[in-house]
From Swiss-Prot:
GO terms for biological process: cellular response to lipopolysaccharide; MAPK cascade; mRNA processing; muscle contraction; poly(A)+ mRNA export from nucleus; positive regulation of polynucleotide adenylyltransferase activity; RNA processing. Gene3D superfamilies: 3.30.70.330. This is Polyadenylate-binding protein 2. It comes from Homo sapiens (Human). The association of the expanded polyalanine mutations together with the capability to oligomerize may induce intranuclear inclusions and cell death. Expanded polyalanine mutations may either result from unequal crossing over during germ cell homologous recombination or from DNA slippage. The pathogenic mechanisms mediated by polyalanine expansion mutations may be either a general disruption of cellular RNA metabolism due to the trapping by the inclusions of PABPN1, mRNAs and/or nuclear proteins, resulting in the induction of cell death; or may change the normal muscle cell differentiation. The modification Asymmetric dimethylarginine is found at residues 238, 259, 263, 265, 267, 269, 277, 279, 287, 289, 291, 294, 296, 298. Disulfide bonds: none annotated. GO terms for molecular function: poly(A) binding; RNA binding; RNA polymerase binding. May interact with SETX. Monomer and homooligomer. Binds RNA as a monomer and oligomerizes when bound to poly(A). Interacts with PAPOLA, but only in presence of oligo(A) RNA. Interacts with transportin. Identified in a IGF2BP1-dependent mRNP granule complex containing untranslated mRNAs. Association in a ternary complex with CPSF4 and influenza A virus NS1 blocks pre-mRNAs processing, thereby preventing nuclear export of host cell mRNAs. Associates in a single complex with SKIP and MYOD1 and interacts with SKIP in differentiated myocytes. Interacts with NUDT21/CPSF5. GO terms for cellular component: cytoplasm; nuclear inclusion body; nuclear speck; nucleoplasm; nucleus; ribonucleoprotein complex.
Length: 306
């Protein structure tokens, strides 16, 4: 009995302690609906006291609750390269620094504000130069077209004549042989001036050396002048006795070696005279035309002095 009383007293003392946050109080409904606290001699109180004493170490072990670990923030999706960045109020770590860095470059009044106008000025100058180059090309093309369409007077190209026209011109022309190498077209025109109106004087020259060959052709305005000029055959011109005969029309396949020399390669200095007796010198404007048959002693060619 003494042991039971001591246990009840211990249970009452334990029940009389201050109720801490880590202690439990077991209520067992009694006859009056509630069990009395620390009532000595009660069986229910005794059982509760033993249970409290037995559970007290477990409660002390479970009393410190571990702090909840902070939840890891899920990785934020990266924005595509062209998408705008987060705003100033997003609160994302590092966003403010990323926004501040370009802000420093944009707000820098040193280089950025000076380079933009200079760059624009350079681009404008390049555009102007390109436009000027295009205009120059257009002008050059127009000038070339005009030159091709209308050659300048006094330097007209060789006129292509039909066979009938060539025969008619040859009928009004004479051949002058043994002409002095230093003679000019003006001197020949003056020598035959009394025979009639002279349209053209052609002095043939060597193709390679450019030296005169010693004969010429003179074209008159009419056939009557040709007959008159034959009277100057074997006359003296610059100390030489010249030979004057009517010019013959040469055709392909007809030999022209009766005058003692091949006539396949030559240059011609031609001077034209119009009806008002004014004259101009066209230079070496004739091209040799002919066929040379190799392996034979004679050459056959078609010769056109005009």
């Amino acid at each position: 009995m003494a042991a039971a009383a001591a246990a009840a007293a211990a249970a009452g003392a334990a029940g009389g302690r201050g109720s801490g946050p880590g202690r439990r109080r077991h209520l067992v409904p009694g006859a009056g609906g509630e069990a009395g606290e620390g009532a000595p001699g009660g069986a229910g109180d005794y059982g509760n006291g033993l249970e409290s004493e037995e559970l007290e170490p477990e409660e002390l072990l479970l009393e410190p609750e571990p702090e909840p670990e902070p939840e890891e923030e899920p990785p934020r999706p990266r924005a595509p390269p062209g998408a705008p960045g987060p705003g100033p109020g997003s609160g994302a770590p590092g966003s403010q620094e990323e926004e501040e860095e370009p802000g420093l470059v944009e707000g820098d009044p040193g280089d950025g504000a000076i380079e933009d106008p200079e760059l624009e000025a350079i681009k404008a100058r390049v555009r102007e130069m390109e436009e000027e180059a295009e205009k120059l090309k257009e002008l050059q093309n127009e000038v070339e077209k005009q030159m091709n369409m209308s050659p300048p007077p006094g330097n007209a190209g060789p006129v292509i004549m039909s066979i009938e026209e060539k025969m008619e011109a040859d009928a009004r022309s004479i051949y002058v042989g043994n002409v002095d190498y230093g003679a000019t077209a003006e001197e020949l025109e003056a020598h035959f001036h009394g025979c009639g109106s002279v349209n053209r004087v052609t002095i043939l020259c060597d193709k390679f050396s450019g030296h005169p060959k010693g004969f010429a052709y003179i074209e008159f305005s009419d056939k009557e002048s040709v007959r008159t000029s034959l009277a100057l055959d074997e006359s003296l011109f610059r100390g030489r006795q010249i030979k004057v005969i009517p010019k013959r029309t040469n055709r392909p396949g007809i030999s022209t070696t009766d005058r003692g020399f091949p006539r396949a390669r030559y240059r011609a200095r031609t001077t034209n005279y119009n009806s008002s007796r004014s004259r101009f010198y066209s230079g070496f404007n004739s091209r040799p035309r002919g066929r040379v048959y190799r392996g034979r002693a004679r050459a056959t060619s078609w010769y056109s002095p005009y």
